[in-house]
């Protein structure tokens, strides 16, 4: 089995499990899949990628709340919301100069999840973070399976 097939197998199994966990815990399954996606898309892997993805997802949640709360200060002035969105989007990109915030798509995923979750960060954050852990488990269990499979195929048969 190649690496892609191994990752596909573990991702399929754990995706089904995630669906059940999300429903059981009252979480947003779609937001969890954004967390999974963030880990898979992050250029860094392992624990470093997990940490960077988590930091960027959480920063996106915060930035979305800044836009939502800031726009609500003067709801009759629509342009304020547009200007805030532009400024915050700029800052979301600029923050990437810091290593822990260097995965820009993760920041936007966190913000999008917060907008879609209507600003309910107490529901969005655990959904994203648990989904992120599932993404880590999906990819790394697939890599483990591929390495184990490769190792078992490379061991020569011993005859008696």
Roles of regions detected by a PLM:
Residues 27-44, 86-120:
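Pore- and pathway-forming membrane helices of multi-pass small-molecule/ion transporters and channels
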Residues 25-26, 71-79, 99-104, 141-153:
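Membrane-interfacial segments
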């Amino acid at each position: 089995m190649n690496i892609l097939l191994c990752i596909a197998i573990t991702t399929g199994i754990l995706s089904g499990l995630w669906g059940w966990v999300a429903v059981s815990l009252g979480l947003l399954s779609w937001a969890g899949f954004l967390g999974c996606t963030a880990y898979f898309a992050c250029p860094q892997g392992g624990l470093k990628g997990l940490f960077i993805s988590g930091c960027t997802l959480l920063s996106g949640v915060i930035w979305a709340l800044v836009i939502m709360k800031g726009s609500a200060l003067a709801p009759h002035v629509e342009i304020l919301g547009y200007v805030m969105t532009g400024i915050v989007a700029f800052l979301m990109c600029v923050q990437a100069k810091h290593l822990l915030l260097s995965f820009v798509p993760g920041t936007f995923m966190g913000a999008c999840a917060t907008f879609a979750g209507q600003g309910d960060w107490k529901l969005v954050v655990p959904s994203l973070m648990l989904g992120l852990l599932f993404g880590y488990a999906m990819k790394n269990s697939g890599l483990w399976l591929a390495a184990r499979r490769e190792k078992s195929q490379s061991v020569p048969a011993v005859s008696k």
